[in-house]
Amino acid sequence: VGGDVEAGLAIAELISGMKKPTVSLVLGGGHSIGVPLAVAPMVTMIAPSASMTIHPVRMNGTIIAVPQAFEYLAKIQERISDFITGHSHIQPERLAGLMRETGQLTADVGTVISGREAQEIGLIDRVGTLSDALEELYGMIERRKAEK
């Protein structure tokens, strides 16, 4: 834990704090720290054939088995989960359940959800294409101009 997770969450915070119109489009597979990045913009979309993999924080390498290490993991997981639920419409309990699922990923914990399912559970605003994402972005820009 550290570099990738911390950097990804920091970038997601930057995107979510922008005042300029922002739209995301998940293509292929959104995985791991890609989930906070996907939900950070003002409007979020996912391609019909795309998927998202939701899983808890992972560690590899040498791990010191002390309570502090597990507390640190729990704090990072809480920060990520809070960001996701704060920038989408998914319920915290639903997100936690998807992260703890044991019947889907081989020898792992987590869930792979389809584009349509990501929308249905409130993780992503809607299913769309690049054209839809650009249309939304240009529409946001035009509405912003009209407000001035």
Residue ranges and their predicted role:
Residues 1-35, 39-148:
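N-terminal organellar transit peptides
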